[in-house]
Amino acid sequence: RSLREIRIGTLRYSEPIASSGLIASIGGLYAEARPGGIIRPLDVRSHVASISLRLRYPLLRQRNQSLFLEGGIAANSTQTDILNTRLISDRQTVIDASLLWQQSGWLDGTTTASLGIYHGTGLFGAMSRSASHPSVAGFDPRFTRVSLLGQRLQRLIGPFSAYASVQGQYSK
């Protein structure tokens, strides 16, 4: 594989705010893809960029469990060209809030559960409903999505463990 096929860079910085446990973070991502193989003659080129600001606050902190309230805003951009013709051009700004519960020790395992709500906005140059080249026809940039996640890592006998994960989402 060539290093030209995919390149990804991410940065994240977190800083505690006061003594309450509040943590602020900023993150960024940039990725380029130029697939080879049998689609190389199509000259597919994709570019993805994202920047996010987040806050995380501990509602409950105990030795064996924690409950966090987290929220943030992310501005995302995706562009894909084929044969020098724009196929996809998405720009989204998403505000989100979630509750995250983490527990360890019960039956010698760890459990994580989260509930999140995400809402698309028109901020920071987000595309409109009439934008050309969206990745999904009729895409509404002011969408709402609710997601659920449950994970369990269970220690078994000796060096063995089992992992299970369940996720679901509803979009409107």
Indicate where each model-derived feature is located:
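Solvent-exposed loop/turn segments connecting transmembrane beta-strands
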Residues: 1-8
